[in-house]
Amino acid sequence: MTEFWLISAPGEKTCQQTWEKLHAATTKNNNLAVSSKFNIPDLKVGTLDVLVGLSDELAKLDAFVEGVVKKVAQYMADVLEDSKDKVQENLLASGVDLVTYITRFQWDMAKYPIKQSLKNISEIIAKGVTQIDNDLKSRASAYNNLKGNLQNLERKNAGSLLTRSLAEIVKKDDFVLDSEYLVTLLVVVPKLNHNDWIKQYETLAEMVVPRSSNVLSEDQDSYLCNVTLFRKAVDDFRHKARENKFIVRDFQYNEEEMKADKEEMTRLSTDKKKQFGPLVRWLKVNFSEAFIAWIHIKALRVFVESVLRYGLPVNFQAMLLQPNKKSVKKLREVLHELYKHLDSSAAAIIDAPMDIPGLNLSQQEYYPYVYYKIDCNLLEFK
């Protein structure tokens, strides 16, 4: 289960005691969760008014950054066009897997200096992730256009003889070219009707050249045949052919056009290969950047909410729980017993809908302790 609960509770005599009590109740004495300390440095508190306003802003920023993280991850999956395992290998944060990064979280002092105000740190994060979001849109648009154009050309060269491009199938020798009077048509003949074609094609219209039809290609259901006739008989031939379930394809042999199409396909295919490597590298780097930013926002939110709930001086322990999938309900009950004394309004019920003004939490997620969920299931495989 790649879901984490990031919680905090006030320090008892020491923060270490708070941690030991939680660890004993959730991990040591039973197997409800894997627990670890979550290290948040001594950030600048600022005024209460600023904290209340920041609480709302961080909630919005959290949702935005999570969205960008998921978009980058999903686009990585789209670009790799590969299995889930292959994608997961590329979704790293600071060079390690996401679970390792979260459980060993260390604040990045270089990126987010703690001498800055909380507001400034949140603005640095917002600016960086907005840039990633904008870059992703432009890079994805360019690559998708290229990929789409290539797929359109590939589709033309796939499918049945009734619909696919015939340029790759036919040769110059299959046609009578540069004749004022004669023209060669290409006809799709169902295999079941091929004997009828052999018997009838010379008489479907006047002025069909005898013995001018050959099988040029075939697919599962049909043959592609050529036939040469006088130009003025073409309309009559088309009509009679259709009545007999023979389909005349609209095709004119033009070497220059066919060469241009081939060159375009080669160019698009080469461009796609050239862009693939740098794009995957960009996605890996910026997934890492966005994910790191997201976890720092979680840390900021825990800090702000802990100060708002537990007061000053700052004295709380942030802790990370990775719930055992089968024990989620029991874990919630144990946490409730541990911390119900922190808030009498939440003491009577667990997971009950409550509307607590000023605290930016969804109704189902108000608990006596500070709580945020981190869900590492970032991909939606179709």
Curated annotation (Swiss-Prot):
Q: Provide a GO biological process annotation.
A: synaptic vesicle lumen acidification
Got any disulfides in this one, which pairs?
none
What Gene Ontology cellular-component terms does the record carry?
A: apical part of cell; ATPase complex; clathrin-coated vesicle membrane; extrinsic component of synaptic vesicle membrane; plasma membrane; proton-transporting V-type ATPase complex; proton-transporting V-type ATPase, V1 domain; vacuolar proton-transporting V-type ATPase, V1 domain
CDD domains attached to this UniProt entry: V-ATPase_C
The protein's matches in InterPro entries, at most eight in alphabetical order, are given as: ATPase_V1-cplx_csu, Vac_ATP_synth_c_sf
Q: Name one GO molecular function term.
A: proton-transporting ATPase activity, rotational mechanism
Tissues of expression: Ubiquitous. Abundant in brain, liver, kidney and testis.
Which Pfam family would be a valid example here?
V-ATPase_C
Where is it localised?
A: Cytoplasmic vesicle, Secretory vesicle, Synaptic vesicle membrane; Cytoplasmic vesicle, Clathrin-coated vesicle membrane
Which PANTHER family does the UniProt entry name for this protein?
V-TYPE PROTON ATPASE SUBUNIT C, V-TYPE PROTON ATPASE SUBUNIT C 1
The entry describes its oligomerization and partners as:
V-ATPase is a heteromultimeric enzyme made up of two complexes: the ATP-hydrolytic V1 complex and the proton translocation V0 complex. The V1 complex consists of three catalytic AB heterodimers that form a heterohexamer, three peripheral stalks each consisting of EG heterodimers, one central rotor including subunits D and F, and the regulatory subunits C and H. The proton translocation complex V0 consists of the proton transport subunit a, a ring of proteolipid subunits c9c'', rotary subunit d, subunits e and f, and the accessory subunits ATP6AP1/Ac45 and ATP6AP2/PRR.
Q: What is this protein called?
A: V-type proton ATPase subunit C 1
Gene encoding it? Atp6v1c1
